[in-house]
């Protein structure tokens, strides 16, 4: 099985138990861009068609922001920003958590 097929299989197995909450830890890790897009669509469809709360944890904001309603940015185990994807893209605290203080943030 490919990496994407394995991820889909794991999600399918998890859904067999009809969970109320689905926790996906780094679901996009080690996947190619096409497979990431496919998995994002699966996650969005699950959100729209089921009564499951989905929690995604990932280090790559670009992968998460395409398939979530709201997100939190953590730094040193503390929430530094939360909101919709469009709000977080423009949030200086979120940018600083990802890029550090090395870059000037306008």
Give the residues covered by each predicted segment.
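Walker B catalytic motif
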Residues: 26-27
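H-loop/switch region of ABC-family ATPase nucleotide-binding domains
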Residues: 58-59
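Helix N-cap at the start of a conserved alpha-helix in ABC-type nucleotide-binding domains
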Residues: 33-35
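Helical segment within the ABC ATPase nucleotide-binding domain
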Residues: 37-49
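Hydrophobic anchor residue at the start of the ABC signature
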Residues: 11
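Conserved catalytic motifs of ABC-family nucleotide-binding domains
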Residues: 18
């Amino acid at each position: 099985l490919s990496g994407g097929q394995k991820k889909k299989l794991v999600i399918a197995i998890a859904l067999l138990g009809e969970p109320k909450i689905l926790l996906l830890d780094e679901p996009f890790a080690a996947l190619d861009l096409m497979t990431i897009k496919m998995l994002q669509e699966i996650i969005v469809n699950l959100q729209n068609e089921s009564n499951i709360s989905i929690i995604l944890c990932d280090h790559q904001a670009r992968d998460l922001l395409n398939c979530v309603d709201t997100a939190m940015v953590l730094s040193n185990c503390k929430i530094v920003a939360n909101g919709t994807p469009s709000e977080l893209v423009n949030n200086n605290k979120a940018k600083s958590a990802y890029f550090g203080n090395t870059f000037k943030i306008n």
